[in-house]
Amino acid sequence: MNNLKKIEYSLKKRKRQESRFKIYGLLGIATAVTFLCIILSSIVMEGKKAFLSTYIKLEVYFDPDIIYTSNDQKEEDIKFANFQKIIKNSLNSFFPEISDKGELRKLSNFISSSEEENLMKLVLKNKQLVGQKITLWLLASSKIDVINKNPDMELIAEEDRLISDLELNWLNEIRSANNIKSNFNKNFFVKADSTEPEQAGIWGSLVGSFFTLFVTLILSFP
């Protein structure tokens, strides 16, 4: 009987230990999941602005004198046309009172340089746009994007701010005309590294990570 009692006692003790281990395991998993959720939510909350881009609405006139530099009106003319000037003219049309070259240069920095290529591709796809004026939403530069997403930065002293008081006044005029909006930042997922922050994306990193994992898996199997 003594042996049976000892066996029963040891079995009960083992079951209690197993139950405790299960509880500890579940608590460990629950703790890990909780911290993972906290980290992910923190990333989303802090980085959600990266998923949005700022766009400015402008009346864009595809001036044939700028686009076609030769009498033949060749496709090569479109590829080498000065679309930066077209964007400058569009901004100047919105602010006709600005005539100073320095101020015009600052104003032209409101729009991302990537839009020059986008306009070129647009005209190549539809050459009938030459000579026409259409309304387009153009991607804003990184500094305008940052200020637009963070209104509190407007309260910072001019010397510590990304843009001057004059540029801030222009931005407020654009806002007053409802010519600014935030849209989903698709470039973040389809573009790679860039020297221009508003054009940077994670595509290159994703592809690199995929192939790294792929090669690792291939080499890890016999």
Indicate residue ranges for each PLM-predicted region.
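Transmembrane alpha-helix signature in integral membrane proteins
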Residues: 200-222
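Charged, alpha-helix-enriched surfaces in structured cytosolic catalytic cores
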Residues: 15, 35, 201, 205
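Alpha-helical transmembrane segments of integral membrane proteins
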Residues: 25-28, 32, 207, 211
